[in-house]
Amino acid sequence: MFEKIPNQNSHSMGDNNTGYYNNNNNNNNNNNNNNNNSNNNNNNSNNNNNNNINNNNNNNNNNNNNNNNNNNNNNNTSQQLPSPQLSQPNSMNTTPNQTSPNLRSSPNRVANNMTQINILTPHLLPGSPSASPIPISSIPTASVYRQPFSSSSSSNHDQGSYPIINTKSIIPSASQLQSQNLNIINSINNNFSKDSPNSQNNTSFNEDTIFIASTTYGSSNTPNNNNNNINNNNSNNNNNSNNSNNNNNSTNNNNNSSNINSPNDFNNNHNNNNNNNNNNNNNNNNNNSSNSNINNNNNNSNNSNNNIDNSNNNNNNNNVRSGNSNVNANGHNRLKRKSKENIYNNNNQNNNNQNNNQNNNHNNNHNNNHNNNQNNNQNNIQNTNQNNIQNNHNQQNNNNHQNNNNQNNNYQNNNNQNSGNNNNQNHHNNKFNQNNNHNQNNHSNNQNKNNHNNNHNNNNHNNNNHNNNNNNHNNNNNNHNNNNNHNNQNNHNNQNNNHNNNQNNNYNNNQNNNYNPNNYGNNYNPNNNYNNSNNPNNMNNNYNHNQNNNNNNNNNNQNYNNNHNNQFNNQNNQIHNQSNNQNNYNQNNNHNNNNQNNNNNNQNNNNNNNQNNNNNNNNINNNNNNNNNNNNGNTGLSSSTNNSKHSSPRSSPNNSPLNYNTNEEYYNSGSSSPSSPGSPNSSILQITDGNNGFNNQNNLNNGNNGNQNYNNNNGQFNNNFDNNGQNNNNNNNNNNNNNNNNNENNRNSPTTTQPQIQTTQPLINGANSAFVFPSTPKTNSSTTLFGVMPNEQETWIEIRDLSCSISKMAKSSLTNGITEEMLNEIKEKGTDLINMIENVTQKEKLERKYNDDDRNRIFPPLTRPRRFRKKKKPNVTEPPVEKVKKKADTLFCTSCGTTQTPEWRKGPAGGKSLCNACGLHYAKLMKKEIQLSKVETTSSPPSTSMNVVNLLN
């Protein structure tokens, strides 16, 4: 049934993209009481959408919600029913396999209620001002899903019937529809009602009819607005700025007015859309001139950038132009033949080509603007990089929603449902075209392939030299990476690749152009989560890295010259320098061959993931060193697989002659054999790293200066040595001098022998070690060591506990400060400790007087006192002074020295002089002594009865 349409002053029936299909967008955007105002608001809303989308280029996090709100409103309607309107080719669901269920599966639905509505349609000549009313009862209707007018974007749908306009009535022009806009709307408002009885007409889809999603062609402003939505959304898909959107508005208004005139203009709309895509690309170039350095710095690179990003697009646009020219002829003939099927197929073909073209335009132009906005916002490059890169998927989703503004489900399906095929197809197309266009970039930017290779050596080494030498080429590399990012969405390694390369490039641009305006401290590197918190000197280090790379690896050569005095270190740095150059070239080949070879893509992904895991855009030189085995495989550099808790896993094999791992217990040397130089048996590496690490404070400091490749202060000086060998202009002299000083003796030759190693190796039990453990005590003739008596073990345990508690209090006082109570407590514990030590020494002096026979007479106590007993909780009312006992009054056992016993016993020293166990043992001995004395008194005179007392004492 027809539902009563609300006031058309707020919803234009002439808006081909509004009404039942785009009513959420209209409810969100149009709230005025005049049709012209509503159309103007449509234009304003489209311009606002363009502004939001252009703001998405700058602040994706801030305006993604706006785009998602506006686009989700259109998304519900676009997924409900594509509107195959002639004035909106981009708003059609043009996938041939995804036709509307209402159009295909249920062609014979019957409209329950029909009203007699006079719809004004002009006659054959497009310039004739006359128009005759056609009753709507003569127009067949079809029941389709529609969404009622509501301000919410709910997906509840009811069924209603819509008129189907015969193609015999020629589509009016925009100038003719202006005067008839209000008449149409008023007639529709007066005739459409819920309660009006209507006749039932059987509807069927003949080849003489075309289904029009909205009722009639209304005012000239609203189709222009719809096409402005299309073209603006095309510009939004291309992420153009406001200038490009305005250009598209101006060009598309002309095209839209011609679109209404004739079916040829409909097909010209495709051509115009393609031209608008080209204009969008040109406007993107203008925007690139404002957002980046492409047009400003290098016009040739700008043209080559268009060739890079839009070579597929231009080829596709040419193909689409030729296809559209065929469509112009064929489509016009099909309209004369009045074939709906052919028209849909024609539209599907056009829109498939258009959507493929838009996919290419979207990917490439969006990458252009994405990177160029990064280059534009170099003052806030971390924020924009984080927003843009963290929201790569969000931007793609926003682009899908922007395409939903176009109601182009085919384009969305090309991005989502056909991601396996379409994205791979784009990937293969980008394989061919990006490589060719990248070579065009090389010739256009550098005009020299050798120069291009040099720029690659600078670019991928730290991407800074590439930015300074040719910012346009840097943007082209970003476009390649972002093409991988958008086209290869199912490869997260490529996306990490783009994280690294984009942030490296823009971050290095930021350093080169602005010298760290807001990148000091923790905000220095957006991905360097490990080095930021510990490295306040990251700024100097990475700035010097950029200077090194801007000097075409002169710093690495300087390292080679500084370490030239040491032969072994010379070979090491030579390997590093060679590996850096090879990695630079290989990474540029990975830029050239990211889309040519999947194996190279995997290697590039491994390298870039290692860049994320190892250095996170701080030490690209050193990451190239660590990742050299992934690219070259046999350069002899070790990435030293870390097994520490804080280090990130690296999968490169350890075939290095140098392994700077000091603690092989925590840092395994990978897959090296015991005989290989990287094995734990090769203590050359351990010794020199111990010297470089512990004796060389510059190495430790420089390791903290932004060059901790996950060292984590655990003694792994692999990357510290690499960094110190190739680090900074400020630190090269110190590090290289220290390396030379420390390594002239240790690394004088690569074939040092084992006795030379042992001379400098820190012994475990030696004097140079941090912990000295005596193996066997030095025995003198005058002194002999006695074992600890069982009765004295408790005393030694308590001495240990007291000393530990004193040390803990001292440590806490260093960090948290000390109070008078803590000082008094430490003093009291110290006096207790001294008293206990004195008692033990007295007992040891007594025990040394006894021989073995006398010692055997003293048995250990049968029961052992518990060390820790539960004590009663002190009363809260007691003053704190009574809690602390005077240490002079503390009792201790004169036999074993313990201070904790359940009961004190009488001993030879008086009452409460023995603990419970010793007192009981003493009592048994006294009983035995008394019994023996009684026996002896009967036979012999009494002897001394103080044997037990002497033994106990």
From Swiss-Prot:
Keyword annotations from UniProtKB, A to Z: Metal-binding, Zinc, Zinc-finger
The molecular function terms in GO held by this entry are: sequence-specific DNA binding; zinc ion binding
Key word Methyltransferase present: no
Q: Where is the composition biased (Polar residues)?
A: 1-21, 90-109
Any single biological process term in GO: regulation of DNA-templated transcription
Residue numbers spanned by region Disordered: 1-109, 216-756, 934-953
Where are zinc fingers of the kind GATA-type found along the chain?
893-918
Q: Which domain of life is it from?
A: Eukaryota
Q: Where is the composition biased (Low complexity)?
A: 22-89, 219-330, 342-683, 690-756
What PANTHER family does UniProt report for this protein, alphabetically? GATA TRANSCRIPTION FACTOR 22-RELATED, GATA ZINC FINGER DOMAIN-CONTAINING PROTEIN 12
Q: What is this protein called?
A: GATA zinc finger domain-containing protein 14
Organism (species): Dictyostelium discoideum (Social amoeba)
Mind giving the lineage of the organism this protein is from? Eukaryota, Amoebozoa, Evosea, Eumycetozoa, Dictyostelia
